[in-house]
Design a protein with these regions (language model features):
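Short acidic-hydrophobic catalytic motif
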Residues: 1-109
Length: 109
């Protein structure tokens, strides 16, 4: 209690130069991408992670240790409705400033 909370949503991503930085109300935490990758790989979409510093530990540069620790401590199934978004047609998003783009389409076989 009394500790700032930063939601891991795209609107809170403020930097991606040397790692992903999440910021909110003047508070920021960096190198969250390895922890986020572990959560995604394990199908976890709702959790609270407490960080005691300005960044997530980089460890070996992968999500492996995060996955191992999450599996070690376990997870709790929540009794809540989960929203799903189904993309029915091809979508392309392009950021003209960075030149990056995201294209969603059919699965490749």
């Amino acid at each position: 209690e009394g500790q700032p909370t930063i939601d891991a949503v795209a609107d809170n991503v403020t930097e991606t130069t040397r790692g992903t930085v999440l910021s909110k109300n003047g508070v920021k935490v960096s190198t969250v991408e390895h922890g986020m990758a572990a959560l995604y790989a394990l199908g976890i979409d709702n959790c609270l992670i407490q960080v005691n510093g300005p960044e997530f530990p980089i460890l070996d540069g992968s999500a492996q240790y995060y996955v191992q620790e999450i599996e070690r401590v376990g997870t709790v199934e929540q009794n809540a409705v989960k929203d799903f978004y189904i993309i029915k047609s091809k979508i392309e998003f392009r950021d003209e400033t960075t030149g990056s783009s995201i294209m969603l389409g059919r699965k490749r076989k």
